[in-house]
């Protein structure tokens, strides 16, 4: 029987079904739009929010530093590390163990020290803070300030993939160090060191690196005997170096 609009029951059902389909379509569109807005916010916001204060550092003294290396290339022992600038264990290594190694072995001509990039903490992040920080550090290295830039990165780090190493922040670190900003920005914007960083990563992976910091003495992985997941102590590394020097 037709209703007040003159529609049969079959036509009423068809109209109801069309309304439901339209409503479902609008809900789906709404979900997609909201999702896109959230993703856009997560990607864009870290690079538009205020940079905030930068904790300055006192420039260090690094014997025979050349880009991401330190010491005499002809030293009898080679020390290599693979690190991610968003890694808290790397920060601890850099601040508490590395200075002792530099003082006792690198500065004395016994060890040639090479830092390798191993950015992986940002693998599932759209902002790629580990990779961007790695490139920025190498751009600073062009001006002889790799190790100071490494220091300012760790000094200002306060969390993984939360905007600490957003592009604008990385530029602010370079400004704090007094770098030539035209040169730095040109290098940074071009992602100049991407291929070298990728090579570092692949080289580390081929050696068995899967976490950071990973430390090698003359190509031999340094292990903490207290546990395979523990970062080697200064004593662990020094013992390996001393053994290599004694050969």
Predicted feature locations:
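A short beta-strand-turn-helix
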Residues: 60-77
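Alpha-helical scaffolding within the catalytic cores
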Residues: 64-65, 97-102, 202
């Amino acid at each position: 029987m037709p209703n007040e609009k003159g529609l049969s029951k079959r036509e009423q059902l068809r109209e109801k079904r069309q309304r439901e389909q339209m409503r479902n379509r609008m809900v789906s569109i709404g979900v997609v739009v909201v999702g896109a807005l959230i993703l856009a916010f997560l990607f864009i916001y870290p690079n538009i929010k205020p940079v905030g204060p930068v904790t300055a550092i006192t420039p260090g003294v690094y014997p025979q530093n050349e880009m991401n290396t330190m010491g005499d290339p002809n030293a009898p022992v080679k020390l290599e590390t693979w690190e991610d600038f968003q890694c808290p264990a790397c920060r601890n290594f850099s601040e508490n163990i590395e200075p002792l190694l530099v003082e006792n072995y690198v500065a004395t001509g016994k060890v040639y020290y090479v830092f390798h990039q191993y950015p992986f903490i940002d693998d599932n992040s759209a902002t790629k803070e580990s990779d961007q920080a790695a490139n920025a550090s190498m751009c600073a290295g062009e001006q002889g300030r790799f190790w100071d830039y490494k220091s300012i990165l760790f000094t200002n780090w306060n969390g993984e993939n939360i905007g600490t190493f957003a592009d604008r922040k990385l530029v602010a670190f370079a400004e704090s160090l007094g770098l030539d900003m035209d040169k730095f920005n040109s290098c940074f914007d071009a992602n100049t060191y991407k291929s070298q960083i990728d090579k570092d990563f692949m080289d580390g992976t081929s050696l068995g690196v899967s976490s950071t910091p990973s430390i090698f003495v003359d190509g031999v992985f340094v292990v903490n005997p207290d546990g395979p997941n523990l970062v080697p102590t200064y004593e662990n590394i020094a013992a390996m170096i001393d053994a290599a020097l004694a050969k």
